[in-house]
Structure formats: structure tokens, C-alpha cells
Amino acid sequence: MDVEVKNFWKEKSNIINWKRKPKKIFTEKKNNKFTWYEDGILNIKSNCIDKNINDNLGEKYAIHYIDKQKNILSVKYKELNNLINNFSLFLKKINLKKNSKVLIHGSSSFETSISMLSCANLGYSHCVLFQELSKEAIEVRVDLIKPDIIISRSEQKEFDLKFKSILRKNKKIKFVSFSNKPVKNKKVFKINKNNFTKFK
């Protein structure tokens, strides 16, 4: 192994916030396969958000998002960090444990990004489902993944069509709605919109 190559990747590893620094920097394997930092552990939220705040970029914009109504949402790193922390706290309050499995049902929205980064922040395994998936396709994934919680942007009509029977069959699954219109169902947790979404 070329020492120069290893030193190059060792230097690049300093860019990353590690929970556990890797000892294996760059490994060449059979059939021209390579691995980088294979024994290191990191958290994506720490590297996407915390690192930028620590580098004095907290007042810089992290996300520009345009919704279907052409409303523009611009959020700075510090604001985004607060939203992620608030949603992380919400997930903890509904008794999710470390290593919980989460299904996030939603389009490429701002709330979906918050949900993903909150799950990463807490160490929850998560999978994102497209909003357009049919009820049958969602059921297959629920049976396969066996999530502890489903997070969705579904409003009442879509909830009744896609999720009502799933929750009836899987009584242990929690359901969180961050719909603009409240979903009427005893099993649904509502998001405090003041703490979560800041559309400007």
C-alpha cells in the first residue's frame, strides 16, 4: 500500500466529526475493492449541522426549500439545529428507544429532512418511503421492516386510505402526523407546529 495514499486519506479524515476515530484509514481488498474508515463511527447530524455551527457558520443558510405553493423557506444552521433538537425531544417523549426503527412517509419536504436528521441524531434506523406509494406497497414495507413508528405528512383522506388498516393490524406501531390539517385518530401523535415548522 502506497504510504502517500494512506497519508492523504488520514489527513482528509480530520474533516469529519467522529464518534470513534478510525484506525483503518484506507484498505485495499481483493478484486480492486477498497474501503475507507471502515472501523470509524460517525453521526450524520453532527457532520451536517453541528460541525458547521462550530465552524461559525450558524448564521449561514442551511436549507432553501420551495413548497408546492411556491412559498420559500430559508433556514439557518442554528435554526435548523433547534428544530432538529425539538423534534428529537418530541420523539424521546413518545418513548422511542435507541435502535428504534422508523418509517418516514413523505415527499422531499423540509419536514422529511428534519425527521431524517432527528432520527440520525438519536441513533434510530430510518427508511424514507415515497409519498406516492400505494397502500399495498406500504404494507409490504411495514411487514418487512417492522417499524416502531411511522412519521407522515398524510392528511385525513390519505391516512384513512393508506394507514388506518395498518395501524389496526399492527397495534404497537406509533404514528406521528405533521400534516397541516389534523388527522382524527386516537393513535396519532400531533406535532406542535410552533416548535417544529417555521415557514417564512
Language model: regions and residue ranges:
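N-lobe entry segment of adenylate-forming
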Residues: 1-75, 79-86, 180-187
